[in-house]
Amino acid sequence: LYIRHLVEVKSKSDSLNMVLTNNLTRSLSKEEMKEVDVQVLKGVVYISLADNMLYKSGSYEINDRAQETLSKIAKIIMDYKDYDVLIEGNTDNVPINTEAATMKNIRNNWDLSALRASSVVQYLINHFGVEPKRLTAGGRGEFNPVASNDTEVGKQRNRRTQIIITPK
């Protein structure tokens, strides 16, 4: 009986995740889909956003063009109240040019990734009314690459912010 219950819970979670993913991908434009990747892995929804869509270079300020995409993601987050959301900043392995950095409090990629994640969290709260207690911000620096940092394309893929949506 217990195992059957676990299977039912997992099945319900998987189907909710598929609905969530389908709703989000349907709401995104073709242009947005070039810079947003949505995946479901082990019952968790991962939304990966390209850094050049979200931020100005070397900065953690949210770009104007990110607003529409973030509004669609915020709507999904608001619709799925039984899910927690982790915002995770990631960078490539190129050290920050601290002399040229537009924000003086960025010492390295750890700082940049954490500040970028925090910016997205605050943007979701301040612009779209997402409940703060559902959101967590974290930075991974260059230590969680999804591609090789040996090529420009790989570095570009590693410069991302992930929105990770998990059942409570």
Regions found by a protein language model. Give the residues of each.
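Periplasmic OmpA-like peptidoglycan-binding domain that tethers envelope proteins to the cell wall
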Residues: 54-68, 72, 80, 90-168
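Extracellular/lumenal/periplasmic "stalk" regions immediately C-terminal to a signal peptide or transmembrane helix
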Residues: 1-39
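Terminal ABC-like ATPase head and other globular end-domains that cap long coiled-coil arms
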Residues: 75, 83-86
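Short Gly/Ser/Thr- and Asp/Glu-enriched loop/turn motifs at secondary-structure junctions
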Residues: 40-44
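Short, aliphatic-rich beta-strand segments
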Residues: 45-50
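Generic structural signal for residues in well-ordered beta-strands
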Residues: 38, 85, 135-137
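Short amphipathic alpha-helices and their capping/turn segments at secondary-structure boundaries
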Residues: 32-34, 38, 70-79
